[in-house]
Amino acid sequence: MMRKILIFICFLLSSNISDAQNLIILAQQETKMYNQTWFYSGSGNSLQETKIKEYWNEDFYINSIAYTSKGWFVTMAKGLKWTNQSYSYKSSWPDEWIHEKKKAGYMITSLSSSNSNWMVVMSQNTDYNAQEICSAPWATQREWIKKWWNNDYYITSVTCRNGMWTVVMSKTSLYTDQTYMFSSTVDGIKEKIKIKWDEGYNSSLKFEIMAKQLYVASQRVL
């Protein structure tokens, strides 16, 4: 079974999820990535687009992005099979841009949002065959997720903004099963993740905080 290191960094030494200073980082061993870097913009600052382009020129690809108490937090890695990557960073949801990129063979590989901007990352040569996107309150999302799970789609990106959850589900052979969890405390979500790892769910996908609850998706992988 894949070994993992779960690193929890709480800047105000608080275990309460409602504390906006909590930053949770998941580090995983034995992946296909052989080099990784990360950087953050600083609270209230714009995305460091120049930095992204510099690392693109060194064959790094964005593999994770989140908006945190430290501003935009970007991780980029080598060793991914993707061949091209693009992103949209703007105040409105980039529907037309996503449509055009899909026609060119791109799929959404990372997604996040701040109060003022969306950040959508799309890549070519992914393991996704098709994608569905839904933006709705969580009460609606639950049924929508079940519907697409039944059609062999899996959650691959998720973000929450102003009470609305945006979920991307992808048709892929990478996963065999998937679940998600909520907790109001850091310790609570740590315990739930460990239980799922013991059950064979060996990859945690995405953390998101909304209404003082921490969300995490986890799946079994091939």
Task: Name what the model sees in each region.
Residues 4-14:
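Sec-dependent N-terminal signal peptides
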Residues 13-21:
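Bacterial Sec-dependent signal peptides at the C-terminal "C-region" and cleavage site
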Residues 20-222:
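Terminus-proximal functional modules
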